[in-house]
Amino acid sequence: MKSIDQNNIAHEFNGESLESVLVTDGSDRALPGVIIIPTVMGVTDLEIGFARELVGHGYNALVADIFGKTFRGAPRDTMFGEMNRLGSDRASLRERLLSVLEVAGGQSEIDSGRIAAMGFCFGGKCALDLARSGADIAGVASFHGLFDPPGLPPEKIKAKVVAFHGWDDPMVPPDAVEALAREMTEAECDWQIHAYGHTGHGFTNPKAADLQIDGVFYTQAAARRSFASLYLFLDELFG
């Protein structure tokens, strides 16, 4: 069985103390790295579990803290307030995400020239925004992410983009899916959208229904299929 190391990484953004989690295979090798951007609830065992799965597939992973160390384990209403705060200034959010990319690239266990990002729900929007920033990143994957554009001057998208979407997600209606497709086409980037029928928001989270939000529920088949496609995507990026 592959050894797995897990370490907290302290960093800052505009004076805010953040604490991301680096999950690696325990060796001294610099491997392709995947930044995992969590849901509105911030860094949890769910994302750390996803990171451990990535290590098993030959990647090291940084579970990104974008909300701040003081919000770890905070109540749902508090976290939704923080999500709204960050989402209200997409230019600042972009800079926050670019700072996380810099942190990831600064880890000796991650090959700074081979980095991808993936995100869930609000984190999916963040992953897309990282691509939209024109960052020098290999690819991004959005899982049940939000597609609304940032309203910032467009940059040349260097990353390959894949979005895994539940067709019945009430937060992302079909016109938003079409709008993302048009946006990515106009940006001339390499993009994919995978839509899963009978699937809502939060479909990768076995505890999604605990949020008690209409249209938010776990779908095992979509979770399995999307992660299988993710690994094909990462293999295409990094070989």
In which residue ranges do the predicted regions lie?
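N-terminal cap/leader regions of alpha/beta-hydrolase-fold enzymes
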Residues: M1-G239
